[in-house]
Regions:
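Conserved glycine-rich cofactor-binding loop
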Residues: 20, 27-28
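Conserved glycine-rich Rossmann-like NAD(P)H-binding loop of the short-chain dehydrogenase/reductase
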Residues: 41-58
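Conserved mid-core segment of classical short-chain dehydrogenase/reductases
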Residues: 84, 105-122, 164-167, 207
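C-terminal substrate-recognition "lid" of short-chain dehydrogenase/reductases
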Residues: 95, 142, 231-260, 265
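Catalytic Tyr-X3-Lys loop
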Residues: 98, 114-133, 151, 168, ...
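Catalytic loop of short-chain dehydrogenase/reductase
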Residues: 106-107, 124, 149-175, 179-188, ...
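A glycine/serine/threonine-rich, flexible loop-to-helix segment
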Residues: 188, 195, 199-227, 237
Length: 266
């Protein structure tokens, strides 16, 4: 356990909060960091995973050993019934739902849109934008009851477009539009909706792009020069923003996109 982990235990933003947080995509880089941070800051957590059962079991065991209330459930969020079942599981197991974090989504290759056929774009919309809607819609009643919060992890690319990122920015842009609409409509019930837009990270999808060669050394150098802080972020940086927006400390913030990108979108 690191010093940062110990600081998480000192910060109990969610201590005593009735119910649980649901994190969609809890075995991904950002998702797992968010699960850990929420749990260590006092929240019960249920997270979803699609196929990586081994990682889900390991994360659950790790946090339970620390005394946290953590459970996982397999769910294909492109399936409307499975997404709704995940919401019911959180409410049934923990009594209420106070936070919903969408940190799921498919791997997104770096490719020019001219090379993306409509069928591939349709699949991306289904696997990301529709998956988010499948999850958030059945959660509304529970979130109204708790005056809860939704945080969608999107991308900084919706505010400053990098070439070959249209598959990500287009579908995540649609998620952001839904978030703003829900913020306007659900605020009367005390429910808040926000987005966190990651920039280039050393883990998560960005790490996979580097590993498979879609981003070579030259591209990485250019990217780093475009970031005022001259470095890449981490999943921990994103989780910090997510948990802040989900907490009562952000109680008057809704309908916003918070870029966590080292200044890339400046």
């Amino acid at each position: 356990m690191t010093d940062d982990d110990n600081q998480d235990f000192d910060n109990q933003d969610f201590g005593g909060r009735k119910g649980a947080a649901l994190v969609a995509g809890g075995t991904g880089g950002i998702g797992a960091a968010t699960v850990r941070m929420l749990a260590r800051r006092g929240s019960a957590v249920l997270f979803t995973y699609r196929s990586n059962e081994q990682s889900a079991e390991a994360l659950t065991a790790e946090l339970r050993a620390e005394g946290a209330q953590v459970e996982s459930v397999r769910a294909d969020l492109t399936d409307e019934d499975e997404a709704a079942s995940a919401i019911r599981s959180a409410v049934d197991r923990f009594g209420a739902l106070h936070t919903l974090v969408y940190a799921a989504g498919p791997h997104v290759p770096m490719v020019h849109l001219s090379k993306v056929p409509p069928s591939q774009y349709r699949h991306q919309l289904h696997a990301d934008t529709l998956a988010f809607y499948n999850l958030v819609h059945p959660a509304l009643d529970a979130l109204r009851a708790s005056a809860g919060s939704v945080v969608a992890v999107t991308t900084a690319a919706t505010h400053r477009y990098p070439v070959r990122d249209g598959l990500s920015s287009g579908t995540k842009g649609a998620v952001e539009a839904v978030v703003r609409a829900l913020a306007a409509e659900e605020g009367r019930y005390g429910v808040r909706f926000n987005c966190v837009g990651p920039g280039m990270l050393t883990d998560g999808i960005a790490a996979r792009l580097i590993e498979n060669g879609e981003l070579d050394d030259a591209a990485l150098q250019v990217t780093r020069r475009n970031i005022p802080l001259r470095r890449f972020g981490t999943a921990q940086d994103i989780a910090e923003a997510v948990t802040f927006l989900a907490s009562d400390r952000a109680g008057f913030i809704t309908g916003q996109h918070v870029a966590v990108d080292g200044g890339y979108t400046v």
